[in-house]
């Protein structure tokens, strides 16, 4: 490959020499003629300069400088800038100084532009170059200074701040960046610098690369020059600024701990992560019986889990890794485990296998966005229940075999309840734990009928095992386990280390610095930067990465131990000291990477206690991908695999993976943006009189409360459940409203054989009586608004008044119609009602018929006792109480929608005592459901079985109907 480029460069050099020879011959001919005037000679010179402009500009900084000042464009090609086509350069640093000298005045404009360097030059300060004059006849200087810069922070650009006692020192960009323009390449040639925004732009000097980035990609760096210049004014007076902003820095430290306290959801949340790991291991062991699941990532390094962040899992066979045969073929492993997860009820939409990445993983996005604070008893019962759905009715042998398969998977004592539906095509089971539920779901069901197929899923859409309700990433490499253990050892060595790491992670995500998809840093790299700063400043002791064993044979921390974010035993005095230290550490982080760290020569590394340079690791030479292999679609001569150049602009060494730069995708343009965000964060933390900073933008936008601590206990187990209860209560109350209080309700008055009836829209009908058949045949809508519905505006006002926090939470996820649908209702003519209210309508119509008949016959309805009277009201009220208390009676082992519980109403309530007093002896012998102290219903002789309640309820209704018919003929008076 080198010989190929060498031939191309020699050809380019010959073309250059031919152009120079031709130009000299023409110039010599003009001198011999002697009659060319000065204007024509100057014009010819400009013509030949323009002719050779492209070739000269690519390799000679002097030509480049002259061309930019003359207004020429820099259109470069890879061929013209590769090594070999360049003549020997005597002093490239001098050429760079001519192009980028900040003290050099612009002759065309007379503007004196200087930069205050102070101590930054000695500490490896990063300063990017401003744009030169783009046009020779332009009206303003273009070194990155604009008119609005003068008003930012009241900072001048004429060096007037030198009166503070700090010497104004001018340096060239080559000195500031610390780059050696004569660095040798991989095989003794000149080092190349490529642009990350232009795939075909390659340069031989770092100064030329910076000039190219600032001139052609200035739209990607809108604030870089301004923020850099303001931050440099702060550098010479750094100690004075810290003393002046002491109270502000302490307030930031207090906010750091408040933000960190919100991420600590307590030990119970960490135990949920432990159970999720055990459940995932049950699934993985169906694929590989010796595989173990490990937790790594932030939950291990921080020692806490907030319940919302994703969890990183690693599948490792420890014995195979010791033999050197792990990981397996990761693409096949991703497909196999994805299929197993989908088999146990994971959604195709929420489960995303990524098999073609550098590290193949499986990503899971939880379907329920409503967060859980505490799981109640009823939710726990439903969460450890699963459902087997068959494609046909099962015989007695099929039932026995399927139940036996479940018991064999979890043990004889692992199953608490098993019940079948009426059609024998669905079996549900409640296990002793959620982990046992997943283990039962992974069993191989045995069936006697060859045509039967089973599908297993959780018994509930919301209350499921912990693995279904968390976001997680599953990989097959053990690097993360060792890395997380190392980070945990560092972060637990100082009480301010973990809170600071959390704030910096939020800042990096909101600022765009933490965006690995677009080629920036990862959260792991940000943590390495934070720890490296703490080690260099002496906040935490150095830990040798080799102290963490590579082998996992003796590894026992499968479930990371919970460590509170804030020690509950610290005193108020100690807390104030921690606030002060945390603020100093956070501000010092931004100052360290803005001015002190030498990005040009050094590497952020935890492998050595001292300073690591790029030359020590061989990272001072950039790997430039040849043109033919930059893309798969570049032609038939390219490589079949797309390659990306490994860049060493910003270097972060991985502690364990050899020769891995965590910033390998960050080129010059992205590096300038990273440094811009560092400047921005530093200035926002030190700005006087401000209570908001871009560093805490994530906490401010999410509405983090000012006081630390866990989430409020006022938030119910799930926000949807409280809204369900309020909706059901509102519908029940609307049905119980007196008929006279509604404008559209019918009023019936009885007296002296005359009645006045006002129906619906106010039409009056007079007569000797009311025809019961006409009222009985009337539709429910003829009596005004639906008896079981509530108006949309009324329901919304109830939500805002009684559950504002829950209503605001769910509206961030769904719109109004989606929310009503999630609650199990529908909107009909502006009213909210259950989606399937056929049974309720029949009951309500029957009550209306009886009321009309009794009014027509002159019977006092207040004195008549009917067991079925008010059944709709009682049903809805009891159902709402079930939603509010979340008892197993209302759950009914199915989705928690109102429409699916109305037919099984006997599971929700028992016969009222008032009705029981008037019940005839024949009906009183019907056994009622006895509720044990544990809260679980006892059905039948065996506790492990439960018969369906719907047939029993139909028998009760049939007997009640017969008794009602008999009582109309011969009134029955029960003994008092």
Swiss-Prot record:
GO cellular component terms given for this protein: mitochondrion; protein-containing complex
Annotated region described as Important for catalytic activity and RNA binding, given as residue ranges: 700-976
Record region (Required for oligomerization and may contribute to the incorporation into the MPsome complex): 1-188
Skewed-composition ranges (Acidic residues): 147-183
Site positions for Important for catalytic activity: 473
UniProtKB keywords: Magnesium, Manganese, Metal-binding, Mitochondrion, mRNA processing, Nucleotide-binding, Nucleotidyltransferase, RNA-binding, Transferase, Transit peptide, Zinc, Zinc-finger
EC annotation from Swiss-Prot or TrEMBL: 2.7.7.52
InterPro entries xref list: MTPAP-like_central (IPR054708), NT_sf (IPR043519), PAP_assoc (IPR002058)
Residues where Zn(2+) binds: 195, 198, 212, 217
Location of this chain's protein in the cell: Mitochondrion
Biological process annotations from GO: mitochondrial mRNA modification; mRNA processing; protein homooligomerization; RNA 3'-end processing; rRNA modification
Role: Terminal uridylyltransferase which is involved in the post-transcriptional editing of mitochondrial RNA, a process involving the addition and deletion of uridine (U) nucleotides in the pre-RNA. Specifically, catalyzes the addition of Us to the 3'-hydroxyl group of guided RNA (gRNA), ribosomal RNA (rRNA) and some mRNAs. As part of the mitochondrial 3' processome (MPsome), catalyzes the primary 3' uridylation of gRNA precursors to facilitate their recognition and to induce their processive 3'-5' degradation by DSS1, and the secondary 3' uridylation of mature gRNAs.
Entry's free-text remark on domains: The C2H2-type zinc finger domain is required for the proper folding of the catalytic domain, but is dispensable for uridylation of single strand RNA substrate.
Name recorded for this polypeptide: Terminal uridylyltransferase 1
Organism per entry: Trypanosoma brucei brucei
